[in-house]
Every structure is written in C-alpha cells, then in structure tokens.
C-alpha cells in the first residue's frame, strides 16, 4: 500500500464510519479491489481513531459535562452514597456509567475472539451475508419502531442492549452505528437519540482498539512483519484525512436523520452486498486475505 492509497482509504473511512453501512466492510472491499489484499485490521483500527477524534470535537461539550459529572460523583465531596455515585440524581453521571456498560460487551468479545476478528470474520462472504441481514433489520425496525424515547430515558438495560449492538460490529458488514442504531430504534429511541448514543458509546471502544492495534503494528514493523501496513507516515496522514472529512460527515448525518428515515442506507447495504457477491463469483474479489507485497 502506497501513501496515496492509504489517504484514499482514510477518505473512505471518514465517509462511511458514521453511516450505518459499515466502514470496515468498505475498507475491506475497496482495499481488496485497489490492493489485491485486505488492508488489515491494524490499519483499519488506527485510522478509525481519526474519525473518533472528530466525534470528540463535535460532542466536546457533552463529553466534558459527562466526564465532569462522572468524576465528580466518584471523588467529589458531595454525594457519597452509592446511589449518588451511580448517577441516581444526575443524568450526566448516569450517562458516564451507561457508556462504560455499553463498552463492556465489545471489550470482552474483542479480547476473547481477537484472532477470529482479524482473520475468519473478515471473509467477504460473511461480510455480504451480514450486510444483507442488518440492512433488512435496519429497514424493518426503523419503519415499524416508535420514536418516543430520548437519551434522558435510557436505563441500565438499554445501555447493555446498545452495547450488544456495538459488539456485533466486530464483524465487518454489521456497522458500529448500524448495530447500535438498529437496537436503539428497536427499543423505541428516536433516530437522533440513537445516533447520539452510537457516537458517544463508540469513543472508548474505538480508541481502545486503535491503541492496541497501534502497539501491535509497532511490534510487527520492528519484527519485519509489516505486511500491507503502509508505514506510519501514510497511516497518520490517512488518520488526519479521516478526522477532517469525518467532522463534516457528522454534521450532515445528524441533519439527515432529523428529517429522513434509514431506508436509503438499508437499500444501499443490500445493493452493495449484491455487487460484492457478483465480484466474488467472478473472481474479481477474494473472500479471504491474499498475501501481497506492501
């Protein structure tokens, strides 16, 4: 992978990360078409840090408020009882705990099934299958679910269900936002509330994965096993592109969901799956990673 190819993949990451279409699937598919090989889980995870930095910038006021309330409940002089520490009297404190709860499923699954996530689950036939399944689920759930619940009505149970939706995004094709939004809409959350929860809940998970993969990439490069990794210069540049373009996409996506349904995204997922299946059948794409020179 050369510098410009890495930059292009950073752009793809930014355009697809927040939409319920699976950025990891797009990176996997376009990487195969462009490079003849999977760009790899390490490169994908690291450039996702760029899009999450855009989320932090956009939601900075919410994040500062939530962190302030959460740390205040733990170390502040007031509210020493257990219920206060858990956010019984402060929604921001509670949201901090909800984000932690929602992060646990993907953290546990990511550690337990790391090898499968980085190999078996990146098979493009699996990607095709889940693109279709979650496309249909998103379409049906969004069309039939009520829009009554806001973020202020979230419960511990809801946070865990959101987290399970995020956990499923470890499979390329599910989509982190697609999983959480689908589960959120199924619980009756408004489209905008489901999106906001999806954005906030992804921050610790994506940063954690990015840092772990960065450490792993450093070890691989030092050992001479870089594979398709384009080098740190290209990877950092791709991450910056993902950050800048990603910020613009966040603004547009939030405006979109306040007016329109997710039907267009569901149709796109299904159409993409059909195209990828045809390319696999014709031998243009490879279902599993092909060893190629960096």
Swiss-Prot record:
One of its GO terms (molecular function) is undecaprenyl-diphosphatase activity. Catalyzes the dephosphorylation of undecaprenyl diphosphate (UPP). Confers resistance to bacitracin. This is Undecaprenyl-diphosphatase. It is an enzyme of class 3 (hydrolase). It catalyses: di-trans,octa-cis-undecaprenyl diphosphate + H2O = di-trans,octa-cis-undecaprenyl phosphate + phosphate + H(+). Belongs to the UppP family. GO terms for biological process: cell wall organization; peptidoglycan biosynthetic process; regulation of cell shape; response to antibiotic. NCBIfam families: PRK00281.2-1, undec_PP_bacA. Bacitracin is thought to be involved in the inhibition of peptidoglycan synthesis by sequestering undecaprenyl diphosphate, thereby reducing the pool of lipid carrier available. The gene is uppP. The chain crosses the membrane at residues 39-59, 93-113, 123-143, 197-217, 234-254, 265-285. Pfam families: BacA. It is found in: Cell membrane. GO terms for cellular component: plasma membrane. The keyword Transmembrane applies. Keywords: Antibiotic resistance, Cell membrane, Cell shape, Cell wall biogenesis/degradation, Hydrolase, Membrane, Peptidoglycan synthesis, Transmembrane, Transmembrane helix. Its EC number is 3.6.1.27. It is a multi-pass membrane protein. It comes from the Bacteria. PANTHER family: UNDECAPRENYL-DIPHOSPHATASE.
């Amino acid at each position: 992978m050369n510098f410009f190819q890495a930059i292009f993949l950073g752009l793809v990451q930014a355009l697809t990360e927040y939409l319920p279409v699976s950025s990891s699937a797009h990176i996997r598919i376009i990487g195969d078409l462009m490079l003849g090989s999977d760009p790899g889980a390490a490169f994908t995870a690291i450039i996702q840090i760029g899009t999450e930095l855009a989320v932090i910038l956009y939601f900075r006021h919410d994040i500062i408020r939530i962190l302030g309330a959460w740390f205040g409940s733990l170390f502040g002089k007031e509210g020493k009882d257990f219920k206060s520490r858990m956010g019984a009297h402060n929604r921001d404190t509670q949201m901090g705990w909800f984000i932690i709860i929602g992060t646990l499923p993907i953290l546990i699954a990511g550690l337990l099934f790391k090898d499968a996530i980085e190999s078996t689950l990146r098979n493009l036939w699996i990607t095709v299958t889940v693109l279709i399944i979650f496309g249909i689920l998103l379409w049906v759930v969004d069309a039939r679910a009520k829009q009554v619940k806001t973020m202020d009505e979230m419960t511990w149970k809801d946070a865990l269900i959101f987290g399970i939706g995020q956990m499923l995004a470890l499979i390329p094709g599910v989509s982190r936002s697609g999983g959480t939004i689908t589960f959120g809409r199924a619980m009756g959350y408004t489209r905008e509330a489901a999106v906001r929860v999806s954005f906030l809940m992804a921050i610790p998970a994506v940063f954690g994965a990015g840092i772990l993969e960065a450490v792993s990439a450093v070890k691989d490069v030092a050992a001479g096993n870089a594979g398709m990794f384009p080098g740190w210069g290209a990877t950092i540049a791709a991450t910056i592109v993902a950050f800048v373009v990603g910020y613009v996409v966040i603004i547009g996506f939030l405006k979109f969901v306040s007016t329109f349904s997710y039907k267009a995204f569901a149709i796109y997922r299904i159409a993409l799956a059909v195209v990828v299946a045809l390319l696999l059948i014709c031998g243009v794409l490879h279902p599993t990673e092909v060893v190629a020179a960096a």
